[in-house]
Every structure is written in structure tokens, then in C-alpha cells.
């Protein structure tokens, strides 16, 4: 991880009057080998985020003095995504800092690698948290899954 991650993001937040920032991130293997990267492309907007979670949790810095304290949902794998969507719905701006300041370790046995859990939680996210109807929730899971597949190619 970039040693100056926090100071870089906090300085960006001060200069841009931002209360929430996120960055792109590198993906490393269990053996610390660089195997890819996730490059977010812009500030988060609800219409884009609902289709693809491009904010890595470990890249986020939030000013809790300005953004009310929110709790993660009880979802096992989509709890961060649910929070980003909630903040966007409530009118908060999620600002992108175009730098790679974090590495995320991809692990074969992690909870986030369990595809069935992720699909189940994605459906719950759309149906219960976003209040979409059953058909729209299934459609949204398919779109989310397709976008995830494209990101992993």
C-alpha cells in the first residue's frame, strides 16, 4: 500500500471540499504478485453505481464530521456497495482521486470469492435495500454479474 495514502487523500479532500474519496487499486495474489488493477473512471453517480460497484472499500476515506455515521448492512459480501448506494441516494458526493494508493489481495478462499454468496447478497441488496421489485432485482443482479465478468477479463 502507498505509504502516504491517508495524507494524499486527506489533502485531496481539503482542496476539493470533499467528504468522501476513493481511488483506483492494484490487485495482488496471495504471494504478493501484481495480477491486475481496478481503475475507477470518475466520481460516483447512482445511475452508474447501481450497475457496477467500482469503489474498493480499502480505497475509501470518509470525513465522519460531515457525513453522518452510517452502519454497514447485514449483507455478508455487498455491505460496502449498499452503503455507497445509500450515500448517493441521500445526496452525498463520492469523489474519485485518480491515483493507485491501495493494493487488494485476491484470495481463493475468501468470503468475497464465494460466487453464490455474492449473487444472493446482490439480490438482497436490490430487492430489500434498494426496494426494487422482484423482476428488476433479478435483472439488476444479471447486469451486475455481467459487469463483474467484464472487469475480470
Specify the residue positions occupied by each region the protein language model found.
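GHKL-family ATP-binding catalytic core of two-component histidine kinases
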Residues: 2-3, 63
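Alpha-helical elements of Rossmann-like donor-binding domains used by nucleotide-donor carbohydrate transfer enzymes
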Residues: 4, 8-12, 82-86, 121-125, ...
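Conserved donor NDP-sugar-binding/catalytic core segment of glycosyltransferases
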Residues: 4-35
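Hydrophobic residues in alpha-helical segments
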Residues: 13, 49, 88, 129-130
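Alpha-helix C-terminal capping segments
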Residues: 13-16, 38-41, 65-70, 123-129, ...
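Glycine-centered loop/turn motif at secondary-structure junctions
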Residues: 17, 91, 130-133
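Conserved nucleotide-sugar donor-binding catalytic segment
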Residues: 20-23, 28, 36-117
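Hydrophobic helical membrane-anchoring modules
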Residues: 103-153
